[in-house]
Design a protein with these regions (language model features):
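Hydrophobic alpha-helical transmembrane signal-anchor segments
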Residues: 1-27
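Short, basic/aromatic recognition patches
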Residues: 30-41, 235-243
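Short, small/polar residue-rich loop motifs at catalytic or cofactor-binding pockets
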Residues: 41-45, 246-249
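Juxtamembrane extramembrane loops of integral membrane proteins
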Residues: 45-88
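Beta-lactam-recognizing serine transpeptidase/beta-lactamase-like catalytic domain environment
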Residues: 56-58, 64, 200-211, 250-291, ...
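Small/polar-residue-rich segments within soluble enzyme cores
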Residues: 84-91, 105-218
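Conserved, well-ordered alpha-helix/loop/beta-strand core segments that scaffold catalytic motifs
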Residues: 207-250
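Single conserved hydrophobic/aromatic residue that forms the stacking wall/gate
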Residues: 432-451
Length: 451
């Protein structure tokens, strides 16, 4: 009777073992694996940003943290090499040989699988550590655990801070940023890798060496047209003048006329406590009324339409004109009398410029505005840097067009342009922009690919 019961009991246990191993085994193995194995993202090294003279504007510095898994090392290896490992560590890191010996022995006795050895060390030192006793056997046999950290550094500090910009990832995984960092983000980012880690004691994770791990692909380098020496001069002088006149904000752009390349951009905005820093890139992102700087566009439009020639005489009307009760005045009291169109532009006469346009385009304002459109004044530069607003050039077909629109436009009011849009036009619409897709890739002095 007892033997029958034991037999039935044994059969039941055997069936249960068979069922767990072959029927539900895969499920439980998967549960165990999910708890002990995990995929981690290995960040790629972001590409550098260089000035045209080869100076670093933005770079990623890589630092390493080193840990030791004391349990994974065999007894023979540990006992025979622990003393020499302590000597090597004392020669290259702080602390004496005795400290390292006692520190590692204690970790071994307590089964510590994630013992801190060094933090924020360079790659050169990591390579040396890989040659040390015990550690030379790697992660599986030598207990060596290496964790890489990447930090973005800006060698110029606050200079051109907004132009160089930044890029971050939001909680939804979208890239957000400003300046060159964001404009060239797709090239600078590279491609992240993947690393499988096994969970060990104390909630720590250790790299599992297998074929699933993928090394990250580092980002490309970008060479800009900025010149660090010129940038430094523009930065200092603009800050000095901004502080002198207690301006709310300011911007300065230095362009190489022959090529259209931007050699320096500097911006300052005032904080509530009266200090200045690069709050925004006003040269790209802020559109304002250009005032007298628009007179070049006005004069070109009139010359292109052949409604004026440079020697035609214009009466500046004692420096004052009236439009529906609103006055247009010259900066010189009494005006400039009768002068030719060339001198109107040279002397920047408001009344003279307004008379040229209102006399020539009376009843046909659309012709003047269409000429401006034909010249591309209403088109953005589209540098690829986010934040550039579209120019605002009113058109007679729009509802807000009125009797003041034409005279006010002629000397730069009632319209909106950014400083860089104005500068581009003044340089014959020649503005150098980099298109990585068209220019292809080159090689810099360090051997890394650049845009």
């Amino acid at each position: 009777m007892i033997s029958s019961i034991l037999l039935i009991f044994g059969i039941g246990i055997g069936y249960k073992l068979f069922y767990l191993q072959f029927v539900e085994g895969e499920k439980y193995r998967k549960i165990a694996e999910d708890k002990t194995l995990k995929s981690f993202t290995v960040n790629s090294v972001r590409g550098n940003i260089f000035s045209e003279d080869g100076s670093l504007l933005a770079t990623s510095t890589t630092k390493y943290d080193i840990y030791f898994d004391s349990k994974t090392v065999s007894k023979n290896t540990f006992d025979s090499e622990i003393k020499n490992l302590s000597i090597s560590l004392s020669n290259h890191l702080d602390r004496e040989e005795k400290f390292w010996y006692d520190y590692i022995i204690d970790a071994r006795e307590n089964g510590n699988r994630f013992l801190p050895i060094a933090k924020n060390i360079s790659q050169d030192l990591v390579q040396k550590l890989k040659t040390f006793p015990i550690l030379r056997y790697g992660s599986i046999r030598g207990g060596l655990i290496i964790e890489r950290k990447i930090k973005r550094d800006y060698p110029l500090g606050k200079i051109a801070e907004r132009t160089i910009g930044y890029e971050r990832i939001d909680e939804k995984g979208n890239y957000r940023g400003v300046g060159l960092e964001h404009a060239f983000g797709p090239y600078l980012r590279g491609k992240n890798g993947q690393m499988i880690k096994r969970k060990i004691s104390n909630g720590q994770w250790k790299v599992l060496e297998n074929n699933v791990n993928k090394e990250p692909i580092d980002g490309l380098d970008v060479r800009t047209t900025l010149n660090t020496s010129m940038q430094d001069i523009v930065h200092d002088y603009l800050l000095e003048q901004t502080q002198k006149y207690e301006a709310d904000h300011s911007t300065a752009v230095l362009m190489e006329v022959e090529t259209g390349k931007i050699r320096a951009i500097s911006n300052f905005g005032r904080t509530d406590d009266g200090k200045y820093y690069e709050k925004l890139n006003y040269s790209i992102g802020e559109a304002t009324e250009p005032g007298s700087t628009f007179k070049l566009m006005t004069m070109i439009a009139a010359l292109e339409d052949q409604v004026i020639d440079t020697l035609q005489m214009i009466d500046t009307e004692n420096g004052e004109l009236d439009f529906y009760g609103f006055k247009v005045r010259d900066s010189r009291k009494g005006g400039y009398g009768k002068i030719n169109a060339m001198d109107i532009f040279r002397l920047s006469s408001n009344t003279g410029m307004v008379k040229i346009i209102t006399d020539a385009y009376e009843g046909k304002s659309e012709k003047f505005v269409n000429r401006l459109y034909n010249m591309g004044v209403n088109n953005p530069i589209d540098l690829g840097i986010k934040g550039e607003p579209n120019p605002k050039i009113p058109h007679p077909s729009e509802n807000d067009w009125n009797g003041l629109s034409l005279p006010w436009m002629s000397y730069g009011y009632g319209i909106l342009l950014t400083p860089l849009q104005i500068l581009s036009f003044y340089n014959g619409c020649l503005l150098y922009t980099s298109d990585a897709a068209d220019e292809g890739l080159g090689v810099d002095l360090g051997g890394r690919r650049i845009i």
